[in-house]
Amino acid sequence: MKSTPENFELKDGRMCTIREIQVKDAEETVEYLKTVSGESDFLNSYPEEIRFSAEEEANLIKGFNESDDTLMLVVELDGRLIANGTITRFRRKKMRHRGNVALAVLKEFWNKGIGTKVLKCLEDYAKKLGLSQLELDYYSGNERGRLLYDKLGFIQVGETPNAIILKDGTRYSSIKMVKSI
């Protein structure tokens, strides 16, 4: 196990647990991903694009857990998955000092301190790996995300215009941010 489970208090006083994802979470993770992808325009997939089976997800989780280069954390409240975050270290020798982070939280749990907690845990893991730079991408309309990343010390370093186009034609740029650790 790469990460020790940790209980923490949400801003509303409820207690939840952040822990490494486990193979037993596969079926619930697929349903969680379908839900969370339908709650925000700022994730890469629509719910109908989440087509993998629980078995395929279990194999993916197993691979994450067997690799030191990837850590996926989940946040659990009363036995329910409510958020996830991932860090993936770049594999090439010249780039192994870098790690990419990603985060998603169910809408009903936004503004409760979960994103901050997950990203801090991922940063702690990155430091254990000896990484010196964290990277992330977010979409230009995601003001809530931008505020979180700014608060945690990420800085904008690039932008890809029209990176996604929604079903209604709305276009968002992809913003690249980095943080030295």
Question: Across the structure, where does each feature detected by a protein language model lie?
Answer:
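Terminal substrate-recognition subdomain of acyl/acetyltransferases
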Residues: 1-14, 168-181
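A short beta-loop-alpha structural element at the N-terminal edge
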Residues: 16-28
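Helix-loop element at the rim of GNAT/NAT acetyltransferase active sites that forms part
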Residues: 30-48
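Acetyl-CoA-dependent GNAT
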Residues: 49-98, 102-106, 119, 180-181
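A short, internal acetyl-CoA/4′-phosphopantetheine-binding micro-motif in the GNAT/acyltransferase core
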Residues: 102-111, 139
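Conserved acetyl-CoA pyrophosphate-binding loop and the N-cap/start of the following alpha-helix
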Residues: 109, 113-121
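Conserved GNAT acetyl-CoA-binding A-motif
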Residues: 119, 126-137
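Conserved catalytic-core motifs of GNAT/GCN5-like acyltransferases
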Residues: 135-138, 150, 155-170
